[in-house]
A protein has these predicted regions:
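Extended, polar beta-sheet/loop recognition surfaces of beta-rich domains
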Residues: 84, 91-92, 100, 136-160
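An aromatic-rich alpha-helical recognition segment common to small helix-rich domains
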Residues: 99, 108, 121-135
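Short, cationic Gly/His-enriched loop motifs
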Residues: 4, 17-21, 28-105, 109-110
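Structured segments of extracytoplasmic/periplasmic soluble domains
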Residues: 20, 49, 134-137, 141
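A short, exposed loop/beta-hairpin motif centered on an aromatic-Gly-Thr core
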Residues: 34-37, 114-125
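GIY-YIG-like beta-to-alpha core
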Residues: 5-17, 120-124
Length: 160
């Protein structure tokens, strides 16, 4: 009989950071360019930060303050609800979550028992702004005010 050892959560997260930094070939395009600060090059350095900042069931993101950031460090990383991290990602079709294109128009929709339309418009940023500002309030109180306000400002300005 094989015995499995459960890996501590901090170690699994630290390992995933390193998999992004040194991706296998199948993930190389997705994770190309990630870097890690010197402090986190050893698991013990990451664990010290993790112990102070971890939020159970949240995921570690380094691109909350800057959507193009690919550097993991204490000043760039933040634990956020997985739904918030997904909200700020582009889905496979190249559009942000909640935005889709039909003909020349962009649509912002959400699902609540059935599909609800927020806006139909001619440009993707406006559709994303409508969707982002609709979904973001569910995270107020689940993350600190500073990152929440920063994300809200980015969505309002069309940066996200």
């Amino acid at each position: 009989m094989y015995q499995t050892t459960k890996i501590p959560r901090y170690r699994a997260i630290w390992n995933s950071i390193w998999m992004k930094k040194n991706p296998v070939t199948s993930n190389a395009d997705t994770f190309h360019g990630f870097t890690v600060c010197d402090e986190w090059k050893e698991a013990d350095g990451f664990k010290a930060w993790y112990d102070l900042n971890n939020v159970d069931d949240y995921e570690l993101a380094c691109d909350i303050y800057d959507k193009d950031n690919k550097h993991y460090s204490p000043s760039t990383a933040l634990f956020v609800p997985p739904q918030l991290a997904n909200l700020l990602r582009t889905r496979g079709a190249g559009f942000p979550i909640g935005v889709w294109k039909h003909g020349d128009d962009y649509h912002a929709t959400y699902w609540f028992g059935q599909r609800h339309s927020l806006v139909d418009c001619t440009d993707e940023p406006r559709a994303w702004k409508a969707y982002g500002l609709h979904k973001l309030p569910q995270f107020r109180g689940k993350i600190a005010d500073e990152p929440y306000n920063h994300i809200e400002n980015q969505i309002t300005l069309g940066i996200r």
